[in-house]
């Protein structure tokens, strides 16, 4: 029976959470702290420690709720072992240097507000004419002063005219204010970054000055939309947690019970902390602080039906009847609650599964069945779930960022971003390097001393041996572990590289050099089997150079008869290109030197037979190893080929490693070459050659055995560990290709492009996803193999420098146990989740930029408005890139949007992509092979949030509704109301666009225009007035109309089309007639953004001239799309009778009053003509159903979706989590017994 090691009291105060290692025996030495990479056992007490850790509080309990860190999510994963866990010898080198996004953490993180979040705010408006005598201070409130009475008293203790609504967001990281009564103070800031100005992103193509839209026109709207898009990715991503034990940070406050205040008697339990002065939504307090009797009466008659606090009927979630969270009715609005609900839906869809997480970890451990050799004494990780009778409530918010969408985002990022491919390749190299660096490396001097020392009497007595040895050492090219690492990383990205052959210079040709040159050439094929399978042209050129050195006549004969190879259509290519082409440029598909030799002379000479045997040996595939993992919930199925199987060395007298067995056949070929050389007189004299070769073969055999140990023990094990990470990230297996000239590529969906009428997309033809050319990242040639063959060996190698290692006659098992324990799978998973979050934000940002440019992200009205007005003109490649950057893609020159520097990327610097498909393609095709469309990369929560934000700002119920149609008239009004419109005229005029000039006898020209006219009858129907009416000026037109209809036409209304093509002379005449109050104007197709203001009549008169000027600007403008800002006034805030001298030139055709809770609080007749509070609209009963949806009950008792029917509801329930349950659950975890090792 195992016992768990207990944490010391001091450990509770540390910021870092140390794992608890279970052991079966107390006499076993405890592993060094902070270095135990074994499976960890985390009892429930750790969760309490996580919550109380100060460093985690600053980041909002990151361990539980932030996508960037999930180590704490293995709370219920436990392992026990009969052995002390080894200290791993290898690990990830530093933190991943992956390309980061500006908002990666912002988009995936969770906020933890200390006060109630809000979207809408109620704002009382003081009356301008209230007597000082009415400013009576409210009654003293002797009880329940906290938390809302002081704030309410400050807002409602003065005389108010009305209570209106505005957007005033209270949310961590977001500043958003949109007030329909003060549009000039509009502000949208996310994480300190303001919504960008479209002027700066259009290169000056569209500005307020040259667009003709005015300062509140199209650029302003586009800027707001961009800000709303940034808000949509962050808003609602919060969790309310009441930090019990820390009074300062608690979000719930207790009410002081006081039965003497009947207005508050129905409020129970505890309240969320709030800024009740900024958000005075607790209307129960109004009867206590206001001096308006009818206002108090309205509140008292209605508000007691609306719950407030924690005492309500919504059942809280619980664990075994323990309260771990509860709903609290608070003063926030249903819109903010809906944003939060959308976030919870996202959390639910990505809910963390311990079973799947354990499967993921177990798919990343070093598997005993995949390690060959003597593994009995080794230890291997194995993860298993512990039995947990009570589900910890904190895990309801634990997520794993993997689903169909994130998988598509990752696949898209791999194909689209060259910067990411390079960054991930570099990180894979760092993982490989952590294992390759475990190699022991000798020097050429060590090798020379080993074979020329006093003890080597045989070698020293053979004088020619020194010449052989010196020639071998001269061929050694310095090769570092970094070189090997970068070369091995090619095995995992072969389809993404466009490699070209490199030349190998062979020196003097003799029997001894044949042995080592053939051996090292075979070694490069063995160490890079995947790379050569994707680049057969490299192998063909390498074999050609070797054969030209040792079989020059034979290879010329073969190529003369069979050619260099054939192309994709089977046509023979006879000549070898003078300049070796790269993979993408190669016109040869199948190479003669890589095929079986069918050409045989009638009497084949010995050298021909050796030549064909050598080709057969070089083309015989060495047995690679495939690391296979099935599909699981958090990863796709992958087959990753590595150069060979990892093998544990078990002493010098064991069987030779597979690669050594394969390579030892080189000695027999070299022996045959020596025999033939003796016959033809190549190289040294016969006696010297025989003596040298005898000693040299012994050395080479020992070097081959040494290489075999290093290859299987270090090189293949490094590849094995890298394969575990590779299979998570990359969308392709690296198995041998069906078409070695096919590259991963990305291409637009042409059918969808045509539907959107997009003709200038940059990726209509597939764009290959290549790595940039890098001379340091290429296969290792034969010269490098000389270095590896002689100088590299494992720490437990039985052979060193071509000689049996007397000091390592048995394996060093403590070192081997530590080495083969492998890299911690949790580290790999952390990198995996970082990449998933990176891909999620990247793919989402790119698609958001795309859908903004096409308008698909917008409502139909906004799409028409912006698509024709700005996007068609300005949304260039540069704007697309800058917009993506605004959304968070990249912050430095090394950003994920940057180009890699490859030739392909240089021709594809346009970042736009609209409907991406991925697949394979060759340079000979213009369509993807195995096309795989990329799905929707935008989170549903972001789409829903953005739709709600657009509706709340620009929709019919929004703060700045965009509507079509307004009229212009200089008629008089005694007072103004928000519902006021210009009176409908009986006659309307539609001007024609053409005109002619008539000349009199004095050759003076007279412009003649034409129009049609309609008479509007009592039913509103339009009846045409005659046919086309000709006129020279407006006064003449009105006289002609009066004659036709039979009565005096007064101020007819002229229709102005959206696309103004009227002659300039006529426009000037219309302006003159309008300013003379002769005609009215109607702009039925022009779009309007409204704002509101309470003004005195004098202020209205001052604003009239500005609107007259705006009418002139509109008529003189020739821009296709218009959007204008019109202010609507109300003068009833000032009581009294005024002369009919006010003119309000611009008024909407269909009036829309601002969102007001109540009006006319101070009127002489106690609210006669005013609007009482509409409790059904602003304070309905909002409940949460079993699925988490918000439902509002209307006056008929019917429950409907709250956000669509009651978007302004100012009291909704929010879920608040507690901490005390974690303490109560302490000690309930019972772990299973799971063996590690044998």
Swiss-Prot record:
It is found in: Virion. Residues 7-30 have a biased composition (Basic and acidic residues). Residues 1-35 are annotated as: Disordered. The keyword Cytoplasm does not apply. Function inferred by structural homology with BTV-fold inner capsid family. Homodecamer; each decamer is made up of two conformers of VP2, called VP2A and VP2B. 12 homodecamers assemble to form an icosahedral capsid. Inner capsid protein that self-assembles to form an icosahedral capsid with a T=2 symmetry, which consists of 120 copies of VP2, with channels at each of its five-fold vertices. This capsid constitutes the innermost concentric layer of the viral mature particle. This is Inner capsid protein VP2. It comes from Cryphonectria parasitica mycoreovirus 1 (strain 9B21) (CpMYRV-1). The gene is S2.
């Amino acid at each position: 029976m195992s016992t768990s090691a207990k944490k010391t009291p001091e450990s509770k105060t540390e910021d870092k959470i140390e794992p608890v290692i279970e052991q079966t025996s107390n006499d076993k030495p405890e592993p060094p702290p902070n270095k135990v990479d074994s499976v960890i056992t985390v009892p429930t007490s750790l969760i309490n420690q996580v919550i109380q850790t100060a460093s985690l509080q600053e980041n909002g309990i990151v361990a539980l709720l932030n996508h960037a860190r999930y180590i704490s999510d293995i709370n219920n994963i436990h392992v026990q072992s009969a052995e002390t866990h080894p200290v791993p010898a290898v690990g990830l080198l530093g933190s991943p240097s992956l390309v980061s996004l500006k908002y990666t953490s912002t988009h995936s993180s969770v906020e933890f507000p200390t006060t109630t979040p809000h979207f809408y705010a109620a704002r009382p408006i003081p009356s301008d004419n209230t007597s000082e005598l009415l400013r009576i201070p409210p009654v003293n409130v002797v009880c329940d002063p906290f938390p809302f009475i002081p704030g309410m008293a400050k807002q409602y203790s003065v005389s108010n005219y009305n209570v209106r609504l505005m957007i005033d967001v209270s949310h961590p990281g977001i500043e958003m204010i949109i007030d329909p009564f003060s549009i000039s103070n509009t502000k949208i800031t996310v994480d300190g970054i303001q919504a960008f100005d479209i002027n700066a992103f259009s290169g000056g193509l569209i500005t307020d000055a040259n667009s003709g839209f005015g300062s509140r026109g199209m650029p302003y709207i586009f800027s707001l939309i961009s800000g709303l898009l940034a808000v949509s990715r962050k808003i609602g991503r919060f969790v309310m947690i009441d930090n019990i034990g820390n009074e300062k940070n608690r979000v719930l406050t207790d009410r002081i019970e006081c039965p003497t205040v009947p207005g508050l008697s129905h409020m129970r339990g505890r309240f969320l902390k709030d800024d009740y002065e900024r958000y005075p939504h607790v209307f129960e307090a109004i009867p206590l602080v206001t001096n308006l009797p009818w206002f108090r009466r309205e509140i008292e008659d209605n508000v007691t039906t609306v719950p407030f606090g924690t005492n309500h009927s919504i059942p809280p979630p619980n664990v075994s009847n323990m309260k771990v969270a509860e709903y609290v009715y608070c003063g926030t609005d249903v819109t903010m609650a809906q944003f939060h609900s959308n976030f919870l839906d996202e959390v639910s869809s990505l809910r963390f599964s311990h079973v799947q997480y354990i499967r993921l970890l177990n798919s990343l451990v070093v598997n005993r069945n995949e390690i060959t050799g003597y593994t009995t004494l080794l230890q291997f990780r194995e993860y298993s779930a512990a039995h947990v009778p009570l589900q910890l409530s904190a895990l309801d918010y634990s997520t794993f960022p993997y689903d169909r969408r994130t998988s598509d985002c990752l696949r898209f990022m791999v194909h689209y971003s060259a910067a990411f491919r390079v960054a991930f390749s570099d990180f894979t190299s760092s993982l490989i390097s952590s294992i390759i660096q475990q190699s022991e490396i000798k020097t050429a001097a060590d090798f020379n001393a080993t074979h020329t020392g006093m003890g080597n009497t045989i070698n020293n007595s053979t004088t020619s041996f020194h010449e052989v040895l010196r020639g071998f050492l001269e061929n050694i090219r310095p090769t570092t572990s970094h070189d090997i690492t970068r070369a091995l990383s090619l095995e995992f990205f072969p389809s993404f590289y466009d490699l070209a052959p490199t030349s190998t210079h062979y020196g003097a040709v003799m029997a001894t050099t044949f042995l080592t040159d053939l051996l090292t050439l075979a070694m490069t094929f063995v160490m890079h089997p995947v790379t050569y399978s994707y680049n057969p042209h490299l192998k063909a050129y390498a074999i050609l150079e070797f054969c030209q050195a040792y079989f020059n006549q034979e290879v010329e004969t073969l190529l003369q008869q069979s050619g260099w190879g054939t192309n994709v259509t089977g046509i023979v290519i006879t000549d070898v290109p003078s300049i070796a082409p790269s993979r993408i440029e190669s016109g040869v598909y199948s190479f003669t030197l890589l095929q079986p030799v069918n050409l045989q002379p009638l009497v084949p000479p010995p050298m021909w037979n050796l030549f064909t045997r050598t080709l057969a040996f070089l083309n015989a595939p060495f047995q690679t190893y495939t690391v296979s993992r099935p599909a699981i919930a958090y990863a796709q199925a992958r087959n990753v080929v590595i150069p060979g199987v990892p093998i544990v060395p078990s002493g010098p007298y064991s069987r030779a490693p597979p690669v050594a067995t394969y390579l030892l056949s080189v000695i027999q070929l070299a022996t045959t070459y020596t025999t033939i050389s003796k016959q033809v007189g190549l190289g040294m004299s016969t006696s010297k050659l025989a003596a040298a070769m005898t000693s040299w073969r012994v050395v080479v055999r020992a070097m081959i055995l040494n290489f075999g140990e290093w290859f299987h023990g270090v090189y293949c094990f490094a590849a094995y560990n890298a394969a575990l990470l590779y299979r998570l990230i990359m969308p392709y297996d690296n198995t041998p290709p069906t078409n070695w000239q096919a590259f991963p590529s990305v291409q637009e969906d042409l059918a969808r492009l045509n539907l959107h009428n997009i003709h200038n997309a940059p990726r209509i033809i597939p764009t290959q996803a290549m790595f940039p050319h890098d001379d340091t990242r290429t296969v290792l040639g034969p010269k490098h193999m000389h270095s590896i063959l002689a100088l590299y060996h494992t720490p437990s190698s039985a052979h060193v420098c071509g000689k049996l290692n007397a000091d390592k006659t048995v394996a060093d098992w403590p070192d081997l146990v530590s080495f083969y324990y492998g890299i911690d799978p949790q580290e790999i998973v952390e990198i995996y989740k970082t990449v998933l979050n990176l891909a999620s934000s990247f793919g989402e940002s790119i698609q958001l930029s795309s859908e903004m440019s096409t308008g698909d992200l917008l409502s139909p009205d906004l799409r028409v408005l912006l698509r024709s007005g700005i996007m068609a003109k300005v949304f260039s490649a540069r704007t697309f890139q800058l917009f993506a950057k605004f959304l968070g893609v990249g912050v430095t020159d090394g950003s994920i949007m940057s180009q890699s520097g490859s030739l392909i990327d240089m021709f594809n610097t346009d970042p736009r992509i609209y409907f991406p498909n991925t697949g394979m393609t060759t340079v000979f095709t213009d369509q993807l092979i195995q096309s795989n469309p990329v799905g929707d990369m935008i989170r549903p929560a972001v789409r829903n949030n953005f739709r709600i934000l657009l509706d709340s700002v620009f929709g019919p119920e929004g703060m700045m509704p965009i509507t079509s149609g307004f009229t212009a008239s200089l008629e008089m009004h005694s007072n103004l109301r928000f519902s006021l419109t210009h009176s409908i005229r009986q006659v309307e005029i539609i001007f024609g666009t053409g005109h002619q000039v008539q000349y009199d006898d004095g050759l003076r020209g007279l412009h003649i225009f034409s129009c049609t006219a309609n008479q509007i009858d009592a039913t509103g129907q339009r009846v045409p007035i005659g046919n086309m009416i000709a006129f020279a000026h407006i006064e003449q037109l009105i006289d002609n109309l009066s004659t036709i209809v039979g009565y005096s036409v007064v101020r007819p209304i002229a229709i102005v089309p959206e696309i103004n093509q009227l002659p300039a002379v006529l426009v000037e005449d219309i302006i003159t007639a309008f300013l003379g109050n002769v005609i009215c104007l109607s702009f039925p197709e022009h779009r309007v953004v409204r704002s509101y203001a309470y003004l005195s009549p004098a202020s209205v008169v001052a604003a009239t001239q500005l609107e007259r000027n705006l009418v002139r600007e509109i008529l003189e403008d020739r821009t296709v799309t218009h959007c204008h800002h019109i202010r609507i006034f109300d003068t009833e805030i000032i009581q009294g009778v005024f002369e009919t001298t006010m003119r309000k030139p611009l008024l909407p055709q269909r009036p829309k009053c601002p969102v007001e809770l109540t009006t006319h609080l101070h009127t002489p007749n106690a609210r006669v003509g005013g609007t009482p509070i509409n409790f059904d609209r602003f304070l309905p009963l909002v409940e949460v159903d079993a699925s988490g949806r918000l439902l509002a009950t209307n006056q008929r008792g019917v429950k409907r979706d709250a956000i669509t029917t009651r978007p302004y509801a100012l009291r909704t329930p929010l879920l608040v989590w507690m901490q005390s349950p974690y303490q109560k659950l302490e000690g309930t975890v019972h772990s299973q017994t799971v063996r590690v090792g044998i």
